[in-house]
Amino acid sequence: MQKQAELYRGKAKTVYSTENPDLLVLEFRNDTSAGDGARIEKFDRKGMVNNKFNHFIMTKLAEAGIPTQMERLLSDTECLVKKLEMVPVECVVRNRAAGSLVKRLGVEEGMELNPPIFDLFLKNDALHDPMVNSSYCETFGWVSQENLARMKALTYKANDVLKKLFDDAGLILVDFKLEFGLYKGEVVLGDEFSPDGSRLWDKETLDKMDKDRFRQSLGGLIEAYEAVARRLGVKLD
């Protein structure tokens, strides 16, 4: 399957059309951003690591009964996916307090959250992805209440699957975001799951193994990504 026209260039991925109107190519680039794209740097191997990481996770979620847009890997940095009508709202699950939750509520970083917190954010960099709720989604027509309920259920199911997967690899799944779309009327998991959109800590040391290493200028970003991938059993080379 050959990529054709560039349809969209995001902060770290480029989307291309194919000869099949129902399929797209996602290309993972080496770009890494923080501050809603205000700071961008390139890291060798990052596109490859995230592409293979994402394929691995999407495969695990599909095996657990979660519908995903993933079709197959095409190359080190590209995968073939179903074309979705994306919902402009992203779902976040928090198992421990970190990031914006700590800033907003003043709670201690690392505090266990039981049950996990479910948040919704409007995908809009210019507005810094404001938090919204189901009432906003209904009023502004972003997603139906039925589909939103399905998104929430699938997000919690993904959390159950991934918490165990990472725990078995000696990692804490602190939080993560998921994006969904519609494929022929069905809610389907889209975009990606990688250390770019999740927080992962080492279970013993609590070392951060995700994009916070870039956000907080801790260094060792790709080394951390590759370490997480190898612990999970992702074949990188």
UniProtKB/Swiss-Prot annotation:
Biological process according to GO: 'de novo' IMP biosynthetic process; cobalamin biosynthetic process
Designated name of the protein: Phosphoribosylaminoimidazole-succinocarboxamide synthase
- Any one Gene Ontology cellular component term annotated for this protein: cytosol
The UniProt transmembrane annotation reads none
Q: Please state the Enzyme Commission number of this protein.
A: 6.3.2.6
Return the similarity comment: Belongs to the SAICAR synthetase family.
- Please state what class of enzyme this protein is: ligase
Coiled-coil residue windows: none
CDD domains for the chain: SAICAR_synt_PurC
The protein's UniProt keywords, in alphabetical order, are: ATP-binding, Ligase, Nucleotide-binding, Purine biosynthesis
Pfam family example for this protein? SAICAR_synt
Q: Which organism is it from?
A: Salmonella arizonae (strain ATCC BAA-731 / CDC346-86 / RSK2980)
Recorded metabolic or biological pathway in which this protein acts: Purine metabolism; IMP biosynthesis via de novo pathway; 5-amino-1-(5-phospho-D-ribosyl)imidazole-4-carboxamide from 5-amino-1-(5-phospho-D-ribosyl)imidazole-4-carboxylate: step 1/2
